[in-house]
Amino acid sequence: MGNKNIKPSKENRLSILSKDKMDSFKRGSFREKSRATIQRFSSLRREHIKVDHPDKFLELKRGIYEIIQKSSSIDVDKRTKLMSNIKTMMINPFMIEGLMTSLENLDPDNKMSYSSVMILGEFDIINISDNEAAFEFINSLLKSLLLEYSISNDLLYAHINALEYIIKNTFNVPERQLILRGQYLTPIFSDLLKYAGLTIKSNILMWNKQFIKPVSDLYTSIRLLHCVTESYKVIGMG
């Protein structure tokens, strides 16, 4: 009879370990998990999943996604021109001040406003005026010009992460004192929050539900601007 206590050789042990790892990988592989995650996200975007108490953050992201999808009629050349015009305007404080003033009094029925002409420049303005979704996209983008320093310093993505942190920790409560540390307490980001009307004492954000609207607007603007700047960089114009 064979000796049951004989240990497997080094080669056999390595083979067994390798097989176990492969089996584990197959049972919960990254590809399978990624596919499941993508499917869940896609179903959320199509709003096939209904919940009794929808998360405000998901609702906000859905709205942004819809604007971006509808604005896909703006072709690459026009997006490139848009970014070129924005970067040109950033070095002219007078133009920025005039643009922001005009946006405060923007008439939704007047597509040929001062701000539209300033930014659109050589665009075919008439066609864009006929496209409500594109105009909504452009208008939201214009309002984000206060973030002009973020374009040149590549800070948009950091702002997105910081705002998402705040949104996830505040939108579902009426009041809260949220401690901000590290990447969530940079001078530039603090200025953005103050622009939205929030109060920061030392490193504590004094939250009230009345700030949901301005923070949502700020987050939407940054996401849209990030979307366009990424497209701008991909085609080699950044």
Curated annotation (Swiss-Prot):
**InterPro entries assigned to the protein according to its UniProt record, in alphabetical order:** Orthopox_A47
Stated family: Belongs to the orthopoxvirus A47 protein family.
Q: What is this protein called?
A: Protein A47
* Organism listed in the record: Vaccinia virus (strain Ankara) (VACV)
Highest lineage ranks of the organism? Viruses, Varidnaviria, Bamfordvirae, Nucleocytoviricota, Pokkesviricetes
